[in-house]
Regions:
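A short glycine-rich, Lys/Arg-flanked "PGG" loop and its adjoining helix->strand segment in the class I
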Residues: 57-72
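Core SAM-dependent methyltransferase catalytic element
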Residues: 111-133
Length: 133
């Protein structure tokens, strides 16, 4: 799922064979109102995207809603909110917000996630978070 119609179209082209075989589907949607029923996914991933999610906690509640019990949510960011150089991106890109690990963990806990594990590359300011429903 992607918010961008352009990204969805490109992903559909790139994954045409897998889509035809029924191995995946690519849909346009908004993470604050995920267009899928409750408890349908084992895994949800967010690569370089939570920066742009409107109302982070609400979006995390939505991810939690569509995950099965015991499901996994993976967040990967190349910015961990501790690098002053990242300020250039938030000035250039309207609506972009870079979160620290602590901010993401707090929002995940509020949304009902447990067993939250954080992995970081402090040299490059990268973070990955794995949370279980």
């Amino acid at each position: 799922m992607d918010y961008s119609k352009v990204s969805v179209a490109e992903s559909q082209k790139l994954n045409a064979a897998a889509i035809k075989q029924g191995k995946c589907c690519v849909v346009q949607g908004d993470v604050s109102a995920i267009p899928f029923p409750n408890a349908v996914f084992d895994y949800v991933s967010a690569f370089e995207t939570v920066y742009f999610w409107p109302g982070l906690k609400k979006c995390f509640f939505e991810v939690n809603r569509v995950l099965k019990n015991g499901g996994t949510f993976l967040i990967c960011n190349e910015s961990d909110g501790t690098n002053d150089a990242d300020e250039k991106w938030t000035k250039l890109i309207d609506g972009m917000k870079i979160y620290t690990s602590d901010q993401l963990i707090a929002a995940l806990k509020e949304a009902g996630f447990t067993e939250i594990k954080t992995y970081s590359n402090t040299k490059n300011h990268w973070i990955s978070i794995v949370a279980t429903k």
